[in-house]
A protein has these predicted regions:
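Conserved beta-propeller blade repeats
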Residues: 99-102, 144, 280-296, 318-342, ...
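Bacterial Sec-dependent N-terminal signal peptides
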Residues: 1-16
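Acidic/His/Gly-enriched intrinsically disordered linker/tail segments
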Residues: 95-103, 111, 116-210, 214-215, ...
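Short, exposed beta-strand/loop patches in secreted or surface proteins that constitute
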Residues: 14-18, 75-76, 286-289, 308, ...
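A flexible loop/linker signature enriched in serine peptidases of the S9 family
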Residues: 165, 169, 299-308, 322-327, ...
């Protein structure tokens, strides 16, 4: 754990630890208040899963990072730990749940997923022989990403007053696609595309996980996570899903999409005239500002990095290509454009700056 921190952070940074019954938290000295808050969340989550399941949840190491300039979190079991980047997102896509609560619910759910996957007989034996490497490989190879991420998004929605599942913006792409009868194969939906607008595995997973819970009950997915990662055949997850539902993964996906299409089409929505260009490659024009007789927009597409464009009567002129953006927001004032980019530290991997 110390090696993980030292290898990527500024050496002079003083660290402290908090230890509870369910977690050992390593944090920068300046982040002690937030570490205490996270410790409380993890203790409550550990108690919740302890009451809900019979799975043994060991004390989990957690590393808090305060020198990164973007919002994220992760779980890995090589070595077994959670990592939090403490700076909250500013774009509102996570809803109004406190950032550290949302992060704790989501990432701790990933931890419990891996623990559930170790519960079947074959995986218990494999874990005893090869440890966390075996768990990492088996879970990663057998359980699709949409199930892992969708289950975590569903959990953050259920265990909080908000969560992404309650944010209208989160499912806007699927609403638009299904209302327009634009559907993709299961393989394309879970793998993504550089040609079409295909929502991420977070969005797909949330819909499929929620559909499974609504139709088959709240505990439906737990047994699939336990048995669907056992390497007793080439497609254990799909086989376990079929055992429970009579449907393959593809059939389950198609049935869920049919359900959501009917549901979304019943919702009220207004039609608007499309003023943007119809392009072959998915493209977004973000936060346009009026400039003289034209517009200044941040253009993002699959075949070009983010750039500022001046748009006049549907004619485009590129102003400037950008680096790694902190977010998509910018300001135009007094003939000057102001935006923020992330600049990585040349020595320390987990340190970066906003310029």
């Amino acid at each position: 754990m110390i090696f993980v921190i030292i290898a990527v952070s500024i050496l002079a940074t003083p660290y402290k630890t908090i230890e509870t019954a369910s977690a050992r938290i390593v944090f920068e000295e300046s982040s002690e208040k937030r570490a205490q808050e996270i410790a409380n969340y993890i203790d409550k989550l550990n108690e919740y899963y302890g009451d809900k399941t019979e799975i043994k949840l060991n004390k989990i190491p957690i590393v808090l990072r305060g020198q990164d300039n973007y919002s994220n979190g992760s779980y890995t079991n090589m070595p077994n730990r959670l990592e939090y980047i403490l700076i909250p997102p500013i774009n509102g896509e996570m809803g109004v749940t406190p950032w550290l609560m949302d992060l704790s619910i989501h990432e701790y759910r990933h931890y419990t997923q891996f623990q559930m996957a170790r519960e079947n007989t074959i995986n218990k034996f494999g874990y005893a022989l090869f440890g966390n490497m075996y768990s990492f490989l088996m879970t990663g190879l057998t359980i699709p990403n949409w199930a892992i991420e969708g289950d975590a998004v569903s959990t953050e929605t259920e265990l909080s007053d908000n969560g992404r599942g309650r944010v209208p913006d989160f499912l806007k792409d699927y609403r638009a696609l299904l209302i327009e009868n634009k559907e993709f194969s299961y393989e394309k939906a879970k793998s993504g595309s550089f040609k079409d607008v295909v929502p991420t595995v977070y969005h797909l997973g949330y819909l499929l996980i929620s559909y499974g819970k609504e139709k088959y009950g709240d505990e439906f997915w737990d047994s699939i996570f336990v048995n669907g990662s056992s390497p007793n055949n080439f497609t254990p997850f799909s086989n376990e899903l079929k055992k429970k539902t009579g449907l393959t993964s593809t059939e389950f996906y198609l049935e869920a999409m049919k359900y959501y299409k009917e549901k979304f089409k019943k919702e009220k929505f207004e039609e608007y005239e499309q003023v943007s260009l119809k392009l072959d490659i998915p493209t977004n024009y973000r936060y346009s500002f009026k400039y003289k007789n034209s517009l200044i927009s941040l253009k993002k597409s699959y075949d070009e990095k983010a750039s500022f464009y001046e748009i006049d009567n549907r004619n485009e002129k590129k102003i400037l290509g950008l680096g790694i953006l902190s977010d998509d927001y910018f300001e135009l004032k007094n003939n000057k454009i102001i935006w923020a980019e992330i600049e990585p530290d040349l020595r320390n991997e987990k340190v970066n700056y906003s310029n």
